Amino acid sequence: GPVGTGDSKCPLMVKVLDAVRGSPAVDVSVHVFKKAADETWEPFASGKTSKTGELHGLTTSEKFVEGVYKVELDTKSYWKALGISPFHEYAEVVFTANDSGHRSYTIAALLSPFSYSTTAVVSNPQE
């Protein structure tokens, strides 16, 4: 397809912003876990945010099946690298995915040293 449409098939994207500096949060470690039948968290995917604060290509629609997922952001390391002592060890988002058919999920996080907020954008996948 045309340039720029490659991400439409990417069912899970993470975007992280630095609310203090008004910039993308670069090189934030992201770990995704999936809840197993015995209620434990199994590692599912991981990566680091890019220069735009985004992380694409974590999984595929085939692997991203219905279930409960946890997205964990290593915010403490991010702030410490900037010489700031943050309050939280990490930021996490736990959610149920694909329970009514396949969707595309963007998990956005806005970080401050003592606060964070997250927003989920859920859309039907592009054909």
From Swiss-Prot:
Posttranslational modification: Sulfonation of the reactive cysteine Cys-10 enhances the stability of the native conformation of TTR, avoiding misassembly of the protein leading to amyloid formation.
InterPro entries: Thyroxine_BS, Transthyretin/HIU_hydrolase, Transthyretin/HIU_hydrolase_d, Transthyretin/HIU_hydrolase_sf, Transthyretin_CS
Stored Pfam families: Transthyretin (PF00576)
Domain of life assignment: Eukaryota
PROSITE patterns, per database record: TRANSTHYRETIN_1 (PS00768), TRANSTHYRETIN_2 (PS00769)
Modified residues (Sulfocysteine): 10
Annotated positions binding L-thyroxine: 15, 54, 117
BP GO annotations: purine nucleobase metabolic process
Keywords: Gamma-carboxyglutamic acid, Glycoprotein, Hormone, Secreted, Sulfation, Thyroid hormone, Transport
Protein location: Secreted
Glycosylation (residues): 98
GO molecular function: hormone activity; thyroid hormone binding
Tissue: Detected in serum (at protein level).
4-carboxyglutamate PTM positions: 42
Main location, first listed in the record: secreted
GO cellular component labels: extracellular space
Keyword Chaperone: no
Family membership noted in the UniProt record: Belongs to the transthyretin family.
Quaternary structure and partners: Homotetramer. Dimer of dimers. In the homotetramer, subunits assemble around a central channel that can accommodate two ligand molecules. Interacts with RBP4.
Protein function: Thyroid hormone-binding protein. Probably transports thyroxine from the bloodstream to the brain.
PANTHER family on file: TRANSTHYRETIN, URICASE AND TRANSTHYRETIN-RELATED
Entry protein name: Transthyretin
Organism of derivation: Oryctolagus cuniculus
Gene: TTR
